[in-house]
C-alpha cells in the first residue's frame, strides 16, 4: 500500500500535497 501523497489525515483533516485528498480510510490519496 504505497501512499504517493505521503500523508495521512487521521490527526489533521487536510492533505498538503498537490492533487491529493483525504480518503475515507484517513489516508491522503490522489483525487
UniProtKB/Swiss-Prot annotation:
The keyword ATP-binding does not apply. Keywords: Disulfide bond, Knottin, Plant defense. There is a cross-link at residues 1-31 (Cyclopeptide (Gly-Asn)). GO terms for biological process: defense response. This is Cyclotide psybry A. Disulfide bonds join 5-20, 9-22, 15-28. This is a cyclic peptide. The presence of a 'disulfide through disulfide knot' structurally defines this protein as a knottin. Belongs to the cyclotide family. Probably participates in a plant defense mechanism. The lineage of its organism: Eukaryota, Viridiplantae, Streptophyta, Embryophyta, Tracheophyta.
